[in-house]
Every structure is written in C-alpha cells, then in structure tokens.
Amino acid sequence: RLDKDTSGLIVIAKHGYAAAVLSKSIEKEYTAVCEGVLKGEGTIDVPIRLKEGYTIQREVAKDGQRAVTHWKVVGGTNHHTLLQIRLETGRTHQIRVHFSHIGHPLAGDDMYGGRLNGIGRQALCCSKVLFVHPVTGHRIELACPPQDDMMALVQ
C-alpha cells in the first residue's frame, strides 16, 4: 500500500494465498526529497499515533506505536536533500511524520509542513520492492527511478 500521491511501485496479488505470503515477506525502499540539508545517514525511532480529532493525520506521541525509519543521503542541493529510506516498521504516513518531526518535512507535503514549491504532491516514491515469489520461492527485485518532478528539486 502507498499513501495517496506517493509514486512508485506496488505489488498486487491475484489470490488470497499469494497476498498472505507477500504481506509477510515484502521489503520496500523509498526515495524522498526533504526540505533543508541533511548529511550522512541516520535512524528515526519515535512512536506514531493517529492525531486526536483527525481521521487520517498522524503525529509523534509517546503513547503511539513503535515506528523506525532508516535513511541515507544520496544527493541534494542547498535547499533539498535526496534520501534513500528503508522502514523497519510500516505505520501510516511514517516517513512523512518522521521527517516533519526532525524539522525536514518532505517537499510538497502540506499535511506535515512541506512547502508546495515546484511539486504538487509529497516528494515520495516507492523505488524498490523485494519479495519471495509465493509459488516459485525465487527472490524478486523490482525497481523504478524517482519521477521527474522529484528529481527537478535536487538538480
């Protein structure tokens, strides 16, 4: 599953058995553009919960569910940073909430503090999916490049 306006890869199972197997073995990597300049790599380990009074928006809170995001800088400019991201947990809006929490919201993510300059959606792409084929047992790796609207922010 991907958030609305997140681009990239999705895997659709044709049968319930395949869906059950895939849900336990699928790994995803994301590419994102955040505002500001980050260096190196890091881990964000703060819990997330549904924001009180909202039906979809999330927030960082001590009583939330554990959420862990690993990130690495792969490029950028003086205004934006291009990131490669791997989730240890898979909470709704996890990447968006975590980067907003550390003061670097995703570009275009107006729900979590990002500015809409140059992009009309959050700058987030599911760029790699890895899974074990439910019938053959072969490891499958799918990849796609980030979309042009995202890359324009870091060139």
Place the predicted regions along the sequence by residue.
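RNA pseudouridine synthases
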Residues: 1-155
